[in-house]
Regions:
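Short amphipathic alpha-helix that is part of the acyltransferase structural core
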Residues: 1-37, 43-60, 147-148, 154-174
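Acyl-donor-binding surface of acyltransferase catalytic domains
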Residues: 70, 119-120, 146, 150
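Accessory recognition modules or surfaces
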Residues: 91, 95, 141-153
């Protein structure tokens, strides 16, 4: 298996992984919602696709990073969604994937990496809860404790109104 950014994969590979993973862990409706989001993100030229790929079984874990534009010139990225195929959960692929993404963007001028997910998972990689006053989410959050970030720069200049990529402009995702 290997980590790749923007791999050359069949167009349905990312959406299928996300739909299968979220259907298994949440519900059929959630699987469809996140699968559709993944499809839209694969079509967004500003979004990077990251994957752990097995040469025999295809994508086993994946995530997207997309820019969060703002008025302060802060180089911000949103890490979402993230999925590990149900057959590969518990094998360390989430750790490998997230750590690889963090390392790849850390040295490339990213000021802040934001995610919305389980604090128990993301806390293991250095994410900490972030106030909506520092980085306002696009919609009210169902789980405010899931709004987290890794800050790579001076915290003083990060406070901004961040605008996410168009595929995230859906209140059902938040």
């Amino acid at each position: 298996m290997q980590f790749q950014t923007n791999p050359n994969c069949p167009p349905d590979a990312f959406p299928a992984l996300f739909e299968d993973t979220f259907t298994a862990s949440e519900s059929t409706d959630e699987g469809r919602l996140i699968g559709h989001l993944a499809k839209q993100l694969t079509l967004d030229s500003r979004t990077d696709n990251h994957a752990i790929i097995d040469e025999h079984h295809g994508i086993r874990a994946a995530a997207f990073t997309s820019p969060l534009t703002n008025e302060n010139g802060v180089n911000a990225l949103l890490l979402a969604p993230v999925a590990v195929h149900p057959d590969n959960q518990g094998q360390g692929l989430a750790r490998w994937l997230i750590e690889s993404i963090v390392q790849s963007i850390k040295g490339n001028g990213c000021d802040i990496l934001i995610t919305y997910g389980d604090p128990a998972l993301y806390g293991r990689f250095g994410f900490e809860g972030i106030s909506p006053e520092v980085a306002r989410p696009p919609y009210p959050l169902q789980f405010p404790e899931g709004w987290q970030a890794i800050i790579f720069t001076d915290k003083g200049r990060l406070s901004a109104n961040y605008q996410c990529a168009k595929p995230f402009l859906n209140a059902d995702l938040w």
